[in-house]
Amino acid sequence: MLRSGIFFVIYFCYLTLIMGLGQRVLLWPAIFLAPQRRRALVRAWLRFHALTTLRMARVFAGVRLTTHGSLPAESCIVVMNHQSVLDIPLGLSLVTGPYPLIPTRDRYRRGIPGISPLARLARFPFLSQKRTLARPELASLTDAADQVARGDQSLLIFPEGHRTDDGRIGRFMRNGLRITLARASRPIYCVVADGMAHIRTFADSFVRFADTHIRVVVLGPFDPPSDDAHVDAFIDMLHQRMTAALDQLRRS
């Protein structure tokens, strides 16, 4: 518990002082002075903080990470399961091509030091996660899918939308995947991570984060469905493959 608490305090200071202040005094001015390099600057910033977060977790909390497989240095669609608050830096660290747009819950648009401003800066699509998409949400997802189709961005999506209590893969919320798969003919990869079900929330991380062993497997590439009529069957296949991979991780 002590090491977990120490990491949490250090990381909160990092979010507030390093990430948050750095965005104000370094990243925003750099984008203002060189707007044509916005994507490259945001990509470098996201990747730096993702890797730094994982290094801090290893050094201060003894977290171990074992990864099998990798993602290509090109625009792609990455479908990842959702177990903990560490999923996003973990997913970002694996994407080596154009930085990924991440469909994000609207409540995270503001209120989280460092992270909320960065999500806005990176132009992530914000969603209410209701059954029916509002018009602005549909427009933002469509725009994100079109950027992926052009090869300007990747997409990192957590289609469960919520973390389950036992870390198993829940039902997929399909709107984001349907739109992306229908508009972006890019290779699809699945990332399955396990070992984080006990740190679902920041409160869990405060007392139980230390000595976590995270295991990750990358599946794919998968070719996109040939037409819109096959999109739902393709999503079902991804869910089945990811569930089987998680079961295999837990048996090994």
Predicted regions, residues:
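Generic preference for hydrophobic
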Residues: 67, 102-103, 218
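Membrane-anchoring hydrophobic helices of lipid-metabolizing enzymes
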Residues: 1-76, 89-90
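Cofactor-binding loop segments of dinucleotide-utilizing enzymes, especially the Rossmann-like FAD-
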Residues: 105, 160, 193-194
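C-terminal alpha-helix
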Residues: 237, 241-249
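Soluble extracytoplasmic domains of inner/organellar membrane proteins
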Residues: 142-146, 155, 160-165
